[in-house]
Amino acid sequence: MLFGAAYYTEYQPYERLAQDLDLMAEAGFSVIRVGESVWSTWEPREGHFELDWLQPVLDAAHDRGIKAIVGTPTYAVPPWLRRKYPETAARSGTGQPIPYGMRQDADYSHPAFRHLAERLVRTIVGRYADHPAVIGWQVDNEPGLRIFHNDAVFQGFLDHLRDRYGDVETLNRRWGLTYWSHRLQDWADLWPPDGNTTPSYDLAWRRYQSRLTQEYITWHAALVRGLVPEDQFVTTCVALGQQGLDISAIGRPLDVAGANIYYATQDGLALPGSDEPDGGLYPFFVSWSGPAWLYLQNDMARGIRQEPFLVMETNATSIGGSADNFPLYKGQARQAVWSMVARGARMIEYWHWHSLHYGAETYWGGILGHSLEPGRTYDELAAIAGEFRQAGSAIEGLRPRSDVAMLLSADSRWAMEFMGPLRGNSPAWFGDPQSYERIVAAFYRGLFDAGLSVDIVSPEQLPSSPEELVERRPVLVVPALYIAEDATLDLLRRYAEAGGHLVLTPRTGYADEEAVARHTVMPGALRPAAGAYYQEFTNVLTPVTITQRDANGPALHGHATAWADGLIAEGATVLAGYDHPHLGQFAAITTHEYGSGRVTYVGTVPDRELSRSLADWLAGVSLPADAWREDRPPTVTCTSATTAHGAVLRFVHNWAWDPVDYRLPGDVRDLFTGESVAAGTALELGPWDVRLLVEDDTGAPSGTRIDPAPAAPITPTSPSPRRTP
C-alpha cells in the first residue's frame, strides 16, 4: 500500500527539500507525485529545457526509501506556447478562444500541441525513466475538462459523421432532421454545435469529445510506455465528473486507474446527515454530502477498469476556494482512507504536501499549512501511515466484496445534461442538467443506507453471456439508462430470464443509441420481462406519499419525488402505489418473476426513506442474509474485503460525534490490537472512528500471520495485459 502526497519543491517560498523529505520519512510516507504542473519550468523557452531541478528531489526521495510518480506537465501550457502558437488555444465556442490564465486551455488534439508535447515528454522521460525512485508515470492531469469548439475539431467531427453514417440522408433520418427544417443537403450544411437544439447531434458531439480525450490519453500513454522500463506503470489522474470524459473508456489505455476522491467534510461526512443529496455549504465540485458520496466515488474509481485503483488526490484538510474552509474533524481522514482501502485503493496520495502561498489554489489546504510547520493534519496522517505499516500483509491484495451492481452510462449522462427529465431550481426548457446524477444518487444512497456494497459497471463492460452476468451480479440496478442499444436491452432481459434480479427505474430504455425516443409502449423491449407498462409520466413537484399495495409484500414507505411513471401492471405484482387523487390509479413499484429471475420496476425517484426500504427488500428477496449489515446503529456502516489469504476483513465505521456500541454478529480479531472478540460483544466505536476486524483467517497459509508485520510498499507493475498494480 502506497501512501504519500503530491510534492512541489518548485512552489516552496524557500529551499527546504531535505526538511520536507525528512518530515515525510518520519511520517511513514512511501510515495510522492512530482512535476506535472510546470511546463514553463521544464521548458522556459521553446526548445530550451531545464531538467536538473527534479534530480535532487528524486535523489532525496530515494535516499529515504520514498518512491515517485512523475507527471508529464502537458495540462498547463506556458505563456510562450500560447503566444507563438495561438492556434492551439482551445475554443469554448466557435471562434471563441479560452483566455489564457487558467489551465487546461489547449486543444490537445491539435498537431502543433502534440508536436510540442511529444518533444517535452520524450525529453523528461528520457532523463528520468531510469531513476531508481521512479515507479510510474502520470500522463497529463484530469483530462476532459473542456469541450473543444475549434475549427479543426469540428471538421474532424464531420469526418467522423461521414464514416459513421455514410451519407447525409442517413444522418437526416437517424437524427430526425426534418424537424424545424434542419435537413442537410450536403455535409457542409451541418451547423456548428453552439446553437444546436437537436438531442442526437448533441449526443454525437459529446461522444466525439470523449473520443478526443481517449485518443489523446492513448497516444500519451503509448508514448511514455515506449520509453520506460517494464516495471514502471502508466496512469492518469481522472476527475470522475469531467464533461469530455467517459470514465470506462479512459481506463483502457492505462496500466492502472488513478482518480481524485474528494468529499464533503465536518458535518458533511455525517451519517445519517442531511436527507437531501447536495453539498450545501461544501465545495462547489462536491456533488452531495455524506459518506455515501465518498463510497460512490470509490466504486466509480474501481469501475474504471474493474480493478484496484490509485487515489491520485484526496482531501488533506480544507479543499476548494477561499470561502471553502472546512478542515476535517479529528478521525475523518482516517475514516476516509480506510473506506478507500476497503473498496480497492492501492495508493492514497494527498493533494498536496504544503498549502500554496500564491495562485488560484492558495486556500486548497495541504498537509502542511502556510506556516509550513507540522500540525494536526500531519500528525493524523502520520498515524494512518503507521496503521498501514502495522496492517502489513493483511491489506495487500484486498478484493472488495460487493452485494449488488449498478449500471452507469456516459451516454445517458450526456443526454440528460442536454435534455434532463427532472426540473431544477428554476424552470428550464431542457430541464435540470444534473438529472442523471440526481437519479443515480437517489438509488445509490438507498443501497448504501441499507448496508449494501456496490460494483459500478458500464454497458460496455457487461459480459455477453447472461449466465455469466447473473453469476457475477445477482442484483443489477439500472438507473436512468435513457440511451440504450437494442442489444443492451436484450441482454438485460436475458439476464433476468437467466436468474438475475433486474431493477429498472424511470427513463431506462426510453431512447435508442441516437437519443431518439422509441416508438413503442414503454418500457419497450423490457415490457414482457417487467410485466408492466406505462404510457404517461409526470414531473412531481411535491413529494407524494407511497402506499403499500401488496398485503403480503414488503412494507415499503417513503415518498415519490421529481418524477412518476404511470405504471400499469400486466402480470407483475404491485408492491406500492401513490397516495394521490390522480396518481393513485397507477402503480409506483412493481415486481415480476420472469424466467428464473425477477424484474422490479421503480417508477419514481425515491426519497431517502423509500430508497432505503426498497434496498432492504431487494436484499431480503435476492441476497443471502448478512447480520453485519442488518442490525446496525444508524451512524454505523460495515463493509468488507477478502484478503490475499482468504480471510474476511471488516471495516466498521461510526460516522458521527456520539460514541456508539455495535454488537458483533461473529467472532473476530482486532487487526491492530490482536485481541480476539467474541460474537455478541458490544464493540465500542468512538467519535468518527473505524475498527478493522479480521473474520475467519483460517485460510492463511501455514506460517503466515495476518498481523502487524511491516510490508514493503506495493509497486504497481504491468497493465492489462502487460502491467498490473
Where are these regions (language model features)?
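Short, well-ordered coil/turn segments that N-cap beta-strands
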Residues: 1, 28-30, 62-68, 130-135, ...
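The substrate-binding groove and active-site-proximal loops of carbohydrate-active enzymes
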Residues: 3-12, 37-52, 99-118, 142-147, ...
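Conserved, mostly hydrophobic/aromatic
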Residues: 5, 24, 32, 61, ...
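Short, acidic/polar
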Residues: 11-26, 117-123, 239-248, 329-337, ...
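Aromatic-lined substrate-binding rim segments of carbohydrate-active enzymes
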Residues: 18-26, 33-95, 220-228, 483
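Polysaccharide-binding and catalytic clefts of secreted carbohydrate-active enzymes
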Residues: 94-296
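Carbohydrate-binding surfaces of carbohydrate-active enzymes
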Residues: 265, 279, 283-716, 721-724
